[in-house]
């Protein structure tokens, strides 16, 4: 060992030094051996082990050992557990357990280069099988290390080479897990472990059952064990855990501390007050242990082998679990089934066949098949596996870990025997640590948990272990061997009463020991099932590897012996809840375990003393801390208890432990129960297990947990000696204990007695134990560590569920610092430091503030549920009533320790209180203060008890509340409040969760009053608590008395409350004001804690965050007032979050003005949902949303975002939306709603933005901040629109109506203001930085800029969202989709509010769908403004077409329309003349002369031509009406009705009507671009005249469906891939083109539109034009069939006259575009909006491509669909959301048709192409687009060649051809129509020249077909008839 030590100060070297480590090792080793899988055992033949002779060098042997604990298969463990449950707990039962018993395998961790080991050929990974010829099987790790260290100059090792080591092979990874500190220390001669026949059943079972947690590196043994919670894959699956435990460097030193060991007999509970001498404790253990644990004496430098031997309680002591004689438990290589190989030898032997003394300590998990359950001697088994299995069977029975855990759970649920609990614990506790782990002191490895944590987490574990031998022996556990190994403790427990639970502890790391004697489960123990707090303590010790450290402080045997000795003496009786409460071990384990995952480090290293706790903790640690099943308290308590109990182990160490416990929270409870847990370790044991476990556990915990293993060994003794026995109060989980143990006065006395416990080990009956406790309390008082303080200190802060947190483990903080009642605890901690490792964990435990981060996690997890409870419990249990169960104390946070005890361990408290623990600690600062009760004890009403910011000065035993800071104040100036003096003597102080939802609030309960104080943060709160506790506890006697009174009162209240309201809430007792306050906090916060689960540090931390943020006092009083006000206001609403004013909503942590729900939801979405497609668009599950709302309304401000229910982002987003929807006062407030709407309608974009910003700034703080926050969030979401498809418009669509609304549901507003709502929200999202920036001087982005920004995004048709901005101008930004349309119509086109309102209605109806569609279209389209342009063009075209239609409803009119369209194109080209053109167009339309000499004017109609089928004026009018209806119905029924009315009226004035119709169609197209485009396309594709209104409506409905699909696709973030632009980039471009044209056309046609629509509706077409455009999309498409026909005819004539050249150019451009994929550019060219043309061409081209794709698809679909029934069309329309593209596609098609008209041959090709496309269309949109592109290229090429001649022909044939080309245009979207019209206009001439006959044939015949098809029959199948014919004819023409 010296060599190892020197070479690698790792486990072997170091661990031998720690007796505790040894113990852990032994236990672990045994357990491991037991863990060997039976299967391996039988068929396994060990290759002969290799013998290596090492010569000791100056540095030692030059190798380090690792302790690897192999756990039995769960099945085996389960069997054992079953056996135990069946009553097979005798030695025989124990034998089966041997196979279940974790096997300590010791393997070479490291070989020093050039060292003796290296020279000898010892290799890393060699498993030690024999040391000097002595098998390590049955020896604990510490024993093996001791053997090695004690070896002479030469060391002969029999090792199993790593490659041959089954265990290592099985646990190749686990065996070498990190985090295991090598053991350093001197191990005295460690006697060989007694034969495996030891009835380790219980302890081994526990160990085995417990998943091995890898102890932190701090504790080599425990660490290793903890570090390997791995089941051997090769071995039986049941062998769930194998842990490599590194023995702490100096467990031996720790071992020396005296520990009060309580031996738990079934019948009698005895407290062993170990003398300070480790040897005595060891001797006690040895006595108990008997020969079996003889070897453990040797471990870790225990000079006295007999000492090392643990006295095992008689088997009878273990009721149902076969109790291994003390010798087995102690001597058997540690408690329970771990081979006593210290350096891993024992384990390695267990792991491998005894014959193979594999040097490599990395054992593989071998679960020896159950062999003889009699004496399990490895020599008796052929295979190591078999041996281990048998041993495991003996130890654990056949139970698997899971089985044991299950039985443990059952035990915790049922007040079952500890034996049963043990199995349950084994199986139930996820966290398990082999005994070695548990024994190995884990200074920092395991996170300690406060008692409350442990209660929350492992009440069952705690309960299951009465006081585990380790815990009981914790006093002796301080002895290095014990300290070294929690296992030793476990052995004590196993061998004694603890065999049951010890085994579990090892397996779990929280050993779930059914008390073999009693058969009580640990849970039962917590419930008070067993009267043996000591057992429980030992159990706790076993549970947490922390006890591993405890063993270090104590000789493992003595530790075990001490613990065991008590165990046999007292039966495992159901401990009174008080007793249970008193059981610090449990508490300690819980605290120890608390947040830590059972990494060996924390568990075993943290508290050597709390070995059993440590063991217990391991279970809790790895898995238990988060496993509420065991019971929140128990879970927490286990870890904490490990620490606490370790404290309990050493009387003085326990003092430390109590402090630690206070830090741990549960430890506080434990200590509190014991009052002087440390001092009264014996006393603690004597009351129940308190003294025993408190002392032993505390010491061990301190020594081991805090110290490194070596330090633990050394310090453990000092810890035991020096640590006042801190009675660690266990906190039973709120629901776990059937009866919460109420600490009996004896417990309290015991706590107090902890100090007074005599150093000498004494066997005391329960009464004697109580007396000892009292003595110790007295001693503690004498020593200055007040027993009351200790007990209170032992009470964990309510917030410190994580008292065993790493912080505690790491930081050696005096318990006093942690324990507000630091009088006792501080000395305890001071004493503990001898074990450096131990002190850290101890301190961590003691200092809940050290655990703040962790403790809050667990505490919040648990402490919300039972934070107060644990604190109060601890306080009550410790201070007032030892009787109080930890649970009660826990639940009674008011009862909690004296004011100082609960939660005063905040980091600041640490700073303040640590130094001031025993002196008047003056603290001052601003606190928010509220008086809960008056002097009469009456509750102050909420109104009478407002939160006030006071400058609080703590002087002596009084708090002075001052209005202003008279001295330094870290807080904001105190609010005015008379200076008050609050006497804090004997006050109870705890963290308040129920009284207020505020965070960082602590409750100060004096004899007559109760106050709430809110600190700025948790640290400050804890500092205050600590300081108050310290000052309040200055007079220990008075404080103790007062505290007891208060605690009694609190307990009564709590009991009353609990009786009335069930423990689960852990609400404070109802009875008194205090109770009420407690209860309320419990209701409000504890459920939250529960939700979070006591075991979840994350949840706790989050909860803390929330708590902090929510309650951290704002620096300003007003904020504080609001925050304070909110929680209270919410209280009435039960923390209502939904349906309450923003002011009343729980504030976010970081912003009091932002509701917590908003903050949480936004953060969750930002964290996880920014890339979620359709986030906020896709609704969440209503049930989940409702459930979450109800939960939040219940006051659950602590949101566990890790909860599965918070995983569904859609639910979260829906929850957020629901929150805003349910706000009584909308986010934009009812008061300012109209102002926002009006501001949004401001035409000047800049002024609009400024006005909006002014209004936003005028919003109330909460509304403003929330809006700011939400806008930033939505902005972040929109920034990821590429992935989530939620552009600002989509988000605005989602949130606009939700945010911008009035409380009263006004449908009119909803419809009319929807665009404004969308626009406002969209603007906020887009302009968030500007709106919420402090720089108001900056000019807002202009509307055009905004529109461009919008435009940059594929904006859905949020015309209503962007109407204001869009209306401001027709810039490309304006053109951005609906926004630009609305902007145009609104701004550029004129205010047109009527139109705007109507448009808003329409757009609002269609917004969602159209937006989505447009988004996708826009996505292909660089900007949505193109769509607007297209809309404009469509409007222009529509106007022109309409104008033309009135003139010519006949072919001539169509020709005129075409000419007009061409002229419109020209007009588009000439924007300046657009108005004139429009007028001319009107005239032309009115004249309906194909020769209207206004080609420029008609140049726009060409766009229309695409849209307008050459129909008679009547038909066009009808079609317009129908279109309006359809487009309106498709786009917006209201709009359609309006449009229909208007249009039908204007139809008389065909130009206006048509203009409006076109506008309407345009609007529809816009809308339909999003929502009704498909229907519009169908309609457009079909001449509306031909299409009956029904068909139109059907088509529109189909279009709507398509829109819905598209919107769905969009919401899904998927591009609309049905028949749309998406499929066809051309269509998309055409859409863009159409929009561009629309915008362009709109500009010229604004007046026309105004006229056509009626100036109000069309007013400058700003809104109406948008509406019209949308309508025109549908109407255009529909009417464009007629109009386009008419116009095409007219325009063709016109174009022939005037626009042929332009048209030719346009056609050439269009053809080129088609060739280039810029088919839309043709429309642009045709449009002649040259400035926009290039970009528009590109975009339009893209759109055309998309649209052509869509149109081709739509056309094919239409062709087929037209033939199909209307519903079929609907289906296809649905499929054709593309219909947007489709409309435009028709436009494009019309362009193509124009081109095709130019090329008759291409027409045929088109037919073939169409045929090709038809099959492709439905299935292959891309192929269609490609095909369209190809066809276009062909068409464009042919058309280009034929352009000029065709143009002439077109003019001639325009009348004929136009109808044909228009039919395609109807299919195309407005932009397509415009393009088609343009192309038709421009191409019409060319087509007229070249293909006129064909086109005419196709067009005319097709038009006739279309018209005929458009007949009602055709309408019935509009897509099929008109679609097919129109699409094909036009499409073919186009092709």
Curated annotation (Swiss-Prot):
**Domain PH, first and last residues per copy:** 920-1033
Per UniProt, the keywords (alphabetical) are:
Cell junction, Cytoplasm, Cytoplasmic vesicle, Cytoskeleton, Golgi apparatus, GTPase activation, Membrane
Gene3D superfamilies named among the record's database cross-references = 1.20.5.220, 2.30.42.10, Pleckstrin-homology domain (PH domain)/Phosphotyrosine-binding domain (PTB), Rho GTPase activation protein
Compartments where located: Golgi apparatus membrane; Cell junction; Cytoplasmic vesicle membrane; Cytoplasm, Cytoskeleton
Under CDD domains, the record lists: PDZ_ARHGAP21_23-like (cd06756), PH_ARHGAP21-like (cd01253), RhoGAP_ARHGAP21 (cd04395)
Please tell me where this protein is predominantly located: Golgi
Q: Where is this region: Disordered?
A: 1-46, 212-237, 339-373, 413-456, 673-718, 862-919, 1056-1126, 1341-1393, 1411-1431, 1488-1510, 1525-1548, 1637-1665, 1688-1733, 1838-1925
Q: Which PROSITE patterns does the entry mention?
A: PDZ, PH_DOMAIN, RHOGAP
UniProt biased composition (Polar residues): 217-237, 348-373, 413-429, 708-718, 1345-1355, 1525-1543, 1646-1662, 1872-1889, 1898-1911
Q: Name one GO biological process term.
A: signal transduction
Name used for this protein in its record: Rho GTPase-activating protein 21
- Source species, please? Xenopus tropicalis (Western clawed frog)
